[in-house]
Amino acid sequence: MLERRIDLWLPTYLSQALDRRRERWRRRDTTTHVLFLVCDHFEPRHRAKEEGQPAQRVQRWREGYGELRSRCQHAFGHAPLHSWFYPPHHGYEHLFALAQYQFEGLGEIELHYHHDGDTSESLRKNLRAVLDEYHSWGLLLESGAPPKPCFGFIHGDWALDNSCNGKYCGVNDELTILQELGCWGDLTMPSANECQTRKVNSIYYAVDDPARPKSHDWGEDARVGQADPKGFFLMQGPLGINWRAPGYPRIENASITDENWGRPDRIQKWLDCNVHVRGRPEWVFVKLHTHGAVERDHDSLFGEKAFEMHRTLNQRFNDGKRFRLHYVTAREAYNIAKAAEHGHAGDPSAYRDFRIAPNATRYYLASAPHRLLQSTPMRVQLEVRDPAQRTRVRLRTPGFVELEAEFATLDVDSHGRTLRLGGCVPGSTGRVVLSPGVHAASVNGAQHSSQENHALALSVESHDVVVTLGS
């Protein structure tokens, strides 16, 4: 118990007991909407024994989680989502694979960051460099014209805002710096260790004080009618004492592991912790965390234990009357919380994109580093770093599915029904795949021939190639 630092959080937890009972009573005659999200401190190099093991873990997640989602979709009519908070010190070589996760709809990518001994200046400099690398794969960018830096955050070693007695951070104004760089909020807590805040089971705002550490130790609750309050947004997961745990009472800290998986008694406790925006108690947020890259915990995240957890969630908390279950990403949870602040009610899934639009790679996936100029449902523009490198781009813009070629610039405009490649290499070849039922009215700058599966084979003759669709 002492190693879980109950001295820091238990007084607040006990003081919330009456509120928890009161809010459950208020929800008895209405539908409780359960917003369920898993935030993964995703570290594929952790305790890797072989050189190729991190890449294998990343690929196993793509396959295994896709299989779990298919099973859940078939069994329950909807599928879970995952939020991978990826740390740069585990390698930029995995960013394309993570962008695939996002493009394929498995979930979304956010930032996990370990550091130590930083100053405000060094943290700004280092984070900007990290963000530039992620942006070159379309990650941590909000879709739009132009795309904007935008990310959720989990601090390494739980030490947000220098909260670990000077270790694993060093910066007292970290909340301010994160906001400056495009961070919409933090999802680090709970930790149930020395970094744990006195504030528990809350969605709230902390005002940064650069003169002292741990400014997020307390703050103002998010509440209906108080839109866009001052401070930095934080969303916590459930923390408390689970008296129904098998064998003996346990500390519930919202962590998913193979040993401590999503058992029915834990699921009930997550809801009982009652994390919500004040004034909207019927929208209950269940934010869990895990260190999911390591093989030992895969069963609890996309194996049989995971499926049993989702079976319990759907059987007990998705009857459509007393409860409705909504699987959300971290970004979507933030948007729904902001919608509650603005007074919205009813179906929270209507507000998944309320404040922050989907991530940029919702609409495209490029196989090479690039600078993204625009990413919307109807248009994608980018410049590749190395025009001599053959680049494959998958698309969700109407009319176009995929292209592969050597080029410097790409502009896919579904409104104008055109795909433009600039800086092409004459004499090279390329390929463009069109949507079913769509045909090319003209191709300028390249000879072309039709192939199977709605594809055009290109023999490039000019530096500029334009494919125009027929009406």
Please provide the spans of the model-predicted regions.
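Structural preference for beta-strand elements that scaffold enzyme active sites
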Residues: 35-39, 79-83, 106-110, 148-152, ...
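C-terminal domain-boundary segment and adjacent tail
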Residues: 13, 180, 185-193, 197-199, ...
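Active-site-adjacent pocket scaffolds in enzyme catalytic domains
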Residues: 1-23, 139-282
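Metal-dependent polysaccharide deacetylase catalytic core of the NodB/CE4 family, i.e.
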Residues: 85-165, 287-289, 329
